[in-house]
């Protein structure tokens, strides 16, 4: 008689994905972030569902409905802050997950990598439309500025913007449709995450050495279930510390002022996790050029499998490429800082240099470092 988990049609799928999955024996803590992203997604869907029960997507009542959630709903303040800070946590895990993929050459699993990029785009879209919903000052003006960027598209730009707005400005219809998008997108993300896993399990996981580990794989359970559980506990401790002690640390004070189309905030800026892209957008004086740079700053990740020049997969034994990688991380931190600063000297030139450096490292310097290291292997 076979074990039920191996014979039952539903249990069999779970078994192949999370129990008997052959896993490399040497994957480090950096491989925990995939499961942590799953945890973040579940957390966001659950808290979002409870918020949607009390939220109203109408310009006259949206702001007061969020206030009502925080003041009158049982533990509404907790659900609201868990959802708001959960987005930040999601992006922290997401950026570390992408960074690990770049460092250890996981992008060579092209299908998994490309679906990951699509997931990143969808997550960014979800976060953007979600940020508009509380209908505070920064929500309204953020929506106005970012949707207006589409008007840079030749011929159809202006029509496209008005079609998305549902009128001639960001108004009631915009808020209603953004709420609809914000509700449906996480479920599309969940479905795509399953496809992401499906493609990953076709090839098996990469490992820190970047070499095949078929000869020494171990079952996922109990080794990596316990390891993922430890990661989840540590992450939740960090998360609840943020939610309970510093709930507004990552938010914008302007969002505690109701949206007013007649009063523009002095500095319009997105949440911290979009600041690097916002800095790249602002560093180009031309509107269409800025929009193209903004999109390409994420799309450039899709070129990584084709820019891989090294004979080795991982950066573990490639000091020159490691230097380039950490220069890229430092550059992204600088871009994030610049994105939050006003458009004035010296921030303008710093942003422009950092933007050029960002594309140079990915498109030129890292492939060159790979070629130099190939030469060094022959010495």
Swiss-Prot record:
Subcellular location: Mitochondrion inner membrane
Membrane topology value: Multi-pass membrane protein
Record's subunit section: The cytochrome bc1 complex contains 11 subunits: 3 respiratory subunits (MT-CYB, CYC1 and UQCRFS1), 2 core proteins (UQCRC1 and UQCRC2) and 6 low-molecular weight proteins (UQCRH/QCR6, UQCRB/QCR7, UQCRQ/QCR8, UQCR10/QCR9, UQCR11/QCR10 and a cleavage product of UQCRFS1). This cytochrome bc1 complex then forms a dimer.
Sequence positions that bind heme b b562: 83, 182
Gene3D superfamilies xref list: Cytochrome Bc1 Complex, Chain C
InterPro entries: Cyt_b/b6_C (IPR005798), Cyt_b/b6_C_sf (IPR036150), Cyt_b/b6_N (IPR005797), Cytb/b6-like_sf (IPR027387), Cytochrome_b (IPR030689), Cytochrome_b_C_euk/bac (IPR048260), Cytochrome_b_N_euk/bac (IPR048259), Di-haem_cyt_TM (IPR016174)
Cofactor binding: number and manner: Binds 2 heme b groups non-covalently.
Keywords associated with the record: Electron transport, Heme, Iron, Membrane, Metal-binding, Mitochondrion, Mitochondrion inner membrane, Respiratory chain, Transmembrane, Transmembrane helix, Transport, Ubiquinone
UniProt xrefs under PROSITE patterns: CYTB_CTER, CYTB_NTER
Binding residues annotated for heme b b566, in chain numbering: 97, 196
Lineage: Eukaryota, Metazoa, Chordata, Craniata, Vertebrata
Sequence intervals crossing the membrane: 33-53, 77-98, 113-133, 178-198, 226-246, 288-308, 320-340, 347-367
GO MF annotations in UniProt: metal ion binding; ubiquinol-cytochrome-c reductase activity
Protein name per UniProt: Cytochrome b
Entry annotated with the keyword Electron transport: yes
Other facts noted in the record for this chain: Heme 1 (or BL or b562) is low-potential and absorbs at about 562 nm, and heme 2 (or BH or b566) is high-potential and absorbs at about 566 nm.
Record keyword DNA repair present: no
Similarity remark: Belongs to the cytochrome b family.
């Amino acid at each position: 008689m076979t074990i039920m988990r191996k014979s039952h049609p539903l249990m069999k799928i779970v078994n192949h994905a999370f129990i008997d999955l052959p896993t490399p024996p040497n994957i480090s803590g950096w491989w925990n972030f995939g499961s942590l992203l799953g945890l973040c997604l579940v957390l966001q869907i659950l808290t979002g569902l409870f918020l949607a029960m009390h939220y109203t997507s109408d310009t006259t009542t949206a702001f007061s409905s969020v206030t009502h959630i925080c003041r009158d709903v049982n533990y509404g303040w907790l659900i609201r802050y868990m959802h708001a800070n959960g987005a930040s946590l999601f992006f922290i895990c997401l950026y570390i997950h992408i960074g690990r993929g770049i460092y250890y050459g996981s992008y060579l699993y092209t299908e998994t990598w490309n679906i990951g990029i699509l997931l990143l785009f969808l997550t960014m879209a979800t976060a953007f439309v979600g940020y508009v919903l509380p209908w505070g000052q920064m929500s309204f003006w953020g929506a106005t500025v970012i949707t207006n960027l589409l008007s840079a598209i030749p011929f159809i730009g202006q029509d496209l913007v008005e079609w998305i707005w549902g009128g001639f400005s960001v108004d009631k219809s915009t808020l209603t449709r953004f709420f609809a998008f914000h509700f449906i997108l996480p479920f599309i993300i969940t479905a795509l995450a399953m496809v992401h896993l499906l493609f990953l399990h076709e090839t098996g996981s990469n490992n820190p050495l970047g070499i095949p580990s078929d000869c020494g794989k171990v079952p996922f359970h109990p080794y990596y279930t316990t390891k993922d559980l430890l990661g989840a506990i540590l992450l939740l401790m960090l998360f609840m510390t943020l939610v309970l002690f510093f709930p507004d640390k990552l938010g914008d004070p302007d969002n505690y002022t109701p949206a007013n189309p007649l009063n523009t905030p002095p500095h319009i800026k997105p949440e911290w996790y979009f600041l690097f892209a916002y800095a790249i957008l602002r560093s180009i004086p031309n509107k269409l050029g800025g929009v193209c740079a903004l999109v390409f700053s994420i799309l450039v990740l899709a070129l990584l499998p084709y820019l891989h020049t090294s004979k080795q997969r991982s950066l573990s034994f490639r000091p020159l490429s490691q230097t380039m990688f950490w220069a890229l991380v430092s550059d992204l931190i600088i871009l994030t800082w610049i994105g939050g600063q006003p458009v004035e000297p010296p921030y303008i030139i710093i942003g422009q240099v950092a933007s050029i450096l960002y594309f140079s490292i990915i498109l030129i310097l890292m492939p060159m470092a790979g070629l130099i290291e190939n030469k060094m292997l022959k010495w």
